[in-house]
Amino acid sequence: MKKITILFVSFVIILSCMSQENNNVNENNESTFKFSTWITANDNKSDKEYISEFKNYKQAGIDEILINTLTDPKLLNRLTILAKKEGLKVHAWIMAMNRPGDTIALKNPEWYAVSKEGKSCFDTRPYVDYYQWLCPNREESRNHILGLVEGLSKVEGIESVHLDYIRYSDVYLPIGLLPKYNLVQETELPEYDFCYCDVCVSKFEDIHNKNPMDSKNTSIDMEWKNFRLNSIRNIVNDAYAIVTKNEKKLTAAVFPYPEMADHMVRQRWDKWTIDEVYPMIYHGFYNEELNWIGYATKQGVDDVQDNMIINTGLYLPDFNSADELKQAIILAKENGAQGVAFYEGPGLTEEFKKVIIEAKQYLK
């Protein structure tokens, strides 16, 4: 903590001494520490509106944008051309296992994940209506997801296909969100425990010669837990093969660090074959202080070592001031992140943009 404080003070002193002309991003001296933001596309916006938005991001020090086009390759292609002209790199953001409003999936009710209670996400959604999770083991549902990945990966000019919701539904919600749903989660609850469809149970039985429904306590059945961790891993690894074939990278938004992701959403991302991850270290969701951003970043960096790049995800509404955001960026950098990503673009206030510009000049 002392090291961070010293660095922060130095950071402030240096920035206060900078001349006004240096407050603009030097595009010819690109920082190795990158700044990204997630954004959601709107097909109704004009090219002129998008050009203005992309210029704004670039002038604010943003290097890369992660765009959710609802898996529309045509819209992605259009926006990629516009963004690249403004000097931005583009990633194709896709909601993977959770497919709200997917018109193809909705015609196939059997594709959806089934809870331990025997209820399908097709018509019984956990927590919120947009939680419409597909089964990771049924051939048709996983092929549908991988087909969407392939379609995006063929768009010329993108950097990566960026997987989001590449996990199961939350076994445990972040503690800061529990009051919103009037929930107490001290053990695994059957309505939030997935997937117990006939395909998953049958595949597990073929490997382990037992039915998870016969377990006295599935929460401590390590084979059943690993089966589900590996089910997500297998989709990621298959997606990696697809995007690599199309000369793109694979990236993903993930839970804060591997052990935590394992516990909360059955996502062990340090075991994946992937190029970069963006751990969503949203400290406010977990009722944590700012320094937790550094802790969670370091935990992930230590777990993956040199196997993948880590970019710390920051949730802008969690920050009460520009100084807090500045500290968060420093914490991420000092604990091994190679970039930060902000959720999401429209939340970048003028004060936050100034922080990014200043940080970009300092964190080379």
Regions flagged by a language model, labelled:
Residues 25-51, 252-256, 316-317:
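Boundary/entry segment of secreted carbohydrate-active catalytic domains
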Residues 39-43, 62-69, 127-143, 220-231, ...:
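The substrate-binding groove and active-site-proximal loops of carbohydrate-active enzymes
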Residues 41-59, 141-152, 258-272, 293, ...:
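Short, acidic/polar
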Residues 48-71, 155-158, 271-277, 335-339:
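Catalytic domains of carbohydrate-active enzymes, especially glycoside hydrolases
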Residues 92-154:
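Active-site-adjacent "subsite" loops/lids of carbohydrate-active enzymes
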Residues 99-127, 166-213:
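Aromatic- and acidic-residue-enriched segments that line the glycan-binding/catalytic groove
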Residues 162-169, 194-263, 308-318:
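Aromatic-lined carbohydrate-recognition surfaces of secreted/lumenal glycan-active proteins
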Residues 274, 279-292, 296-299, 306-364:
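Substrate-binding cleft of secreted/luminal carbohydrate-active enzymes
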